[in-house]
Amino acid sequence: MAKTYDYLFKLLLIGDSGVGKTCLLFRFSEDAFNTTFISTIGIDFKIRTIELDGKKIKLQIWDTAGQERFRTITTAYYRGAMGIMLVYDITNEKSFDNIKNWIRNIEEHASSDVERMILGNKCDMNDKRQVSKERGEKLAIDYGIKFLETSAKSSANVEEAFFTLARDIMTKLNRKMNDSNSAGAGGPVKITENRSKKTSFFRCSLL
Amino acid sequence: MERGKMAEAESLETAAEHERILREIESTDTACIGPTLRSVYDGEEHGRFMEKLETRIRNHDREIEKMCNFHYQGFVDSITELLKVRGEAQKLKNQVTDTNRKLQHEGKELVIAMEELKQCRLQQRNISATVDKLMLCLPVLEMYSKLRDQMKTKRHYPALKTLEHLEHTYLPQVSHYRFCKVMVDNIPKLREEIKDVSMSDLKDFLESIRKHSDKIGETAMKQAQQQRNLDNIVLQQPRIGSKRKSKKDAYIIFDTEIESTSPKSEQDSGILDVEDEEDDEEVPGAQDLVDFSPVYRCLHIYSVLGARETFENYYRKQRRKQARLVLQPPSNMHETLDGYRKYFNQIVGFFVVEDHILHTTQGLVNRAYIDELWEMALSKTIAALRTHSSYCSDPNLVLDLKNLIVLFADTLQVYGFPVNQLFDMLLEIRDQYSETLLKKWAGIFRNILDSDNYSPIPVTSEEMYKKVVGQFPFQDIELEKQPFPKKFPFSEFVPKVYNQIKEFIYACLKFSEDLHLSSTEVDDMIRKSTNLLLTRTLSNSLQNVIKRKNIGLTELVQIIINTTHLEKSCKYLEEFITNITNVLPETVHTTKLYGTTTFKDARHAAEEEIYTNLNQKIDQFLQLADYDWMTGDLGNKASDYLVDLIAFLRSTFAVFTHLPGKVAQTACMSACKHLATSLMQLLLEAEVRQLTLGALQQFNLDVRECEQFARSGPVPGFQEDTLQLAFIDLRQLLDLFIQWDWSTYLADYGQPNCKYLRVNPVTALTLLEKMKDTSRKNNMFAQFRKNERDKQKLIDTVAKQLRGLISSHHS
């Protein structure tokens, strides 16, 4: 089967139930918004192909259920994620406070080099705001993570969020590839070791 | 001798005659002697008469002398006394003269007074004569003055009576006076003036009743409404009343939860309390709003003037014109109920006036005329209603319009106008009402389904539990026993849809009120409408949601559960309709509810959509496949994309535990079959021109991952190896190639028990060709390696044999 993309990036959306994870994904993949809240059951995903630096990148974005009862199932997907978005609701302070817990989950279950990003969603509802932008920024800085306020309803910053995360993953990937090439030049044994890892991006680059 | 006899006879007669004449002369007054004497001269015997006369004179003289002689002494005495008297008389004369002179002197004043008296009497006589004349003339003048006053104060009928009286009774008595002649000349003009002014009054009257038609009609409609309210109170049946009251109580309970779809109609359908009735104002009658006297006066005036027919024709003509005006509906009548109400009020007002005139005049209008007008009015009204009601898109407006039409019909029926055609038209409007309702409910259902969260309804208290159970007939002993918090299996849209179906039924019933339909007819009508609602409107709404792009498994699974419960509730809807229409339970319904079919169809569609949805997810994963078909390396684990795919399927079936068993099994089987078919296509597609054994090995690892999933029992209820059968074709094909078991395959081909029963020779050949191409590409190197040459030879041999099989199979 002829491949229609250059890279595959797997992203994960996590956060409390009702903060707007599914709506963000829906806005990004379908450019639409559904006002009715339908609680996600288990796990779902959507795929959208974007272009970065002339490369076709398939984003497979996993949408997780925020409810506690689905935690076991959703946690299993952390390992495969290359980028994770932690989402809270600016009108719900509790969801912001829980970001720390979600970060702890990531450190426990995700790969150590996973790219992360914090999103404060529903920024169109400023009249009901409970979490200031400054607090969001400070939290992100504390963890060395990028931060954006978004609105799935008004589509503010949604594209920017996903493209930013994808670009960061691409940057990291390019850095790894440069390191690999340099090591490869040093000796054939290392090249063999790299091939045996069978990471998808590495194999693609050889083609 | 005869001659002498005759002469003698004549002489006797003459003598007698002369004797008679002489007696008459002696006895008759001097004044009358003429005719007597003339009679003498008329004859021819006046000579003889003269002789007789002379004779009689001498006789009389002789007698006088005798008498004088006899009385001579007395005569002398008398003369003596006379001479004495003469002296005395002279004295008396002197005395009288003196007296007379004195009287004359004294009476001179009296004479003057008498003269004055005479003058006065003359004057008095003249005055009396003048007064007598004036007494004749005065009534005429008074009457004329009265006439003028009556004309001025516009009391024209009395004026006309006065005029008639004047002309025929008073004026003839004094017709010789000049002023009377002037009056006589003026009378025709005055009569014309009365006529014209009366006509003007009539026109004002016509204008007045035209302006007040609306008010008159409104009044009549209110009276009919009041009468109906009274009838309702009297005829109210306890059963229906209590049921309606119960419904209202239900609304009170759920006031904050359920939004009434027909608040206005609900209020309209309420039964008025007696207390409310007493508080109503006294509604004035039509005659209180309009002064009919002008038409009566005008009618009398024209009758007296002998122009009654002219008047009747004019009146009818004008009223026909007004009728056409009244029957012209305003162009935007359909926009509001008030538009219709005003239209009806005008029509009712018009006919109430005509009816009033029919009963209070003699022949100005007759039944035939009114019936003709009504027939025209009815056809025009119905045409207008058909046109304008077709623009209505608001079922509440249609319902209110129907109530208004019923009231309109009832009002006019009281006045004796036939209204059957209106009720026939109402049945047409009912169909339109149904269509309007269906459109409205389509919107309602769409809103309900769009706003649903497709999650089981959570309840945290007994109160909430009872509320939900009160809205939807759901009974589950086990759920009832569970502790709080707990969940109903269905989502919010189930009780909402159920209640909206009942609201729809109420709305249909509301239209049937007052249409004089039997309960069986109402029942059938409601069932037909409800069937349309269920089989068309609700069905379309559900299908639209199910077919919606981006609908998720969450929604689809919940829809399956929801429609199962709605299907079970259909029997309660049947009972609901039976109760609400009061049809006896034993009655055989000509119309049945088909709701169960709708929900079955929706469920099947949702199930199909689940299968489609899952397969689309599988396709998305497959698009991520990135096999290196030329790899020589032997891998030790399945491809990333496939591991993710299997994990996704596993977690999906794990979390949707509330999916009905058979649906879950079918979905799982459908997914596995789709996956197997897709993988096979992936392997055989033309774009893959070459592949190595290593690639097949990797592919085999993926298929094993699938088989592992199938064996793991992701969904309960499958027979031990049923699910694995989905991958059997792939398994046998891969085993054949990896184990290079061609001798067995070729030897056993066609046998019922052969090991590779499911491997199609065409498929095998296609795949083999891809491997041969690989070898052929390395032909130059192969020459130097015996193993490679041998392998190529073997491939060619097998290919040849496969072609043989294919050929023989075709022949």
Curated annotation (Swiss-Prot), chain A:
CDD domains: Rab8_Rab10_Rab13_like
Membrane topology label: Lipid-anchor
Gene3D superfamilies to which the protein is assigned, alphabetical: P-loop containing nucleotide triphosphate hydrolases
Entry-annotated residues carrying Phosphothreonine: T72
Reactions catalysed, as given in the entry: GTP + H2O = GDP + phosphate + H(+)
Molecular function in Gene Ontology: GDP binding; GTP binding; GTPase activity; signaling receptor binding; TPR domain binding
Gene Ontology CC: cell tip; endosome; endosome membrane; extracellular exosome; perinuclear region of cytoplasm; peroxisomal membrane; phagocytic vesicle; phagocytic vesicle membrane
Enzyme Commission identifier(s): 3.6.5.2
PROSITE patterns named among the record's database cross-references: RAB
Listed result of changing T72E: Phosphomimetic mutant. Loss of binding to GDI1, GDI2, CHM, and CHML
Keyword Protein biosynthesis appears in the UniProt entry: no
Subcellular location: Cell membrane; Cytoplasmic vesicle, Phagosome; Cytoplasmic vesicle, Phagosome membrane; Endosome membrane
Stored Pfam families: Ras
Binding site for GTP: 17-23, 35, 39-40, 66, 121-122, 124, 152-153
Subunit structure comment from the entry: Associated with actin, delta-catenin and alpha and beta tubulins. Interacts with OTOF. Interacts with PEX5R. Interacts with RAB3IP. Interacts with VIM. Interacts with CDH1. Interacts with MICALL2. Interacts with GDI1, GDI2, CHML and CHM; phosphorylation at Thr-72 disrupts these interactions. Interacts with MICAL1.
Its job: The small GTPases Rab are key regulators of intracellular membrane trafficking, from the formation of transport vesicles to their fusion with membranes. Rabs cycle between an inactive GDP-bound form and an active GTP-bound form that is able to recruit to membranes different sets of downstream effectors directly responsible for vesicle formation, movement, tethering and fusion. RAB8B may be involved in polarized vesicular trafficking and neurotransmitter release. May participate in cell junction dynamics in Sertoli cells.
Family label: Belongs to the small GTPase superfamily. Rab family.
Entry note about domains: Switch 1, switch 2 and the interswitch regions are characteristic of Rab GTPases and mediate the interactions with Rab downstream effectors. The switch regions undergo conformational changes upon nucleotide binding which drives interaction with specific sets of effector proteins, with most effectors only binding to GTP-bound Rab.
Name of the featured protein: Ras-related protein Rab-8B
From Swiss-Prot, chain B:
UniProt keyword list: Coiled coil, Disease variant, Dwarfism, Exocytosis, Protein transport, Transport
Disease: Spondyloepimetaphyseal dysplasia with joint laxity, 3: An autosomal recessive bone disease characterized by multiple joint dislocations at birth, severe joint laxity, scoliosis, gracile metacarpals and metatarsals, delayed bone age and poorly ossified carpal and tarsal bones.
Coiled-coil parts of chain: 50-119
Disordered as annotated region, ranges: 260-280
InterPro entries named in the record: EXOC6/Sec15 (IPR007225), EXOC6/Sec15_C (IPR046361), EXOC6/Sec15_C_dom1 (IPR042045), EXOC6_Sec15_N (IPR048359), EXOC6PINT-1/Sec15/Tip20_C_dom2 (IPR042044)
Name of the gene: EXOC6B
Subunit text: The exocyst complex is composed of SEC3, SEC5, SEC6, SEC8, SEC10, SEC15, EXO70 and EXO84.
The protein's name: Exocyst complex component 6B
Function comment: Component of the exocyst complex involved in the docking of exocytic vesicles with fusion sites on the plasma membrane.
Organism superkingdom: Eukaryota
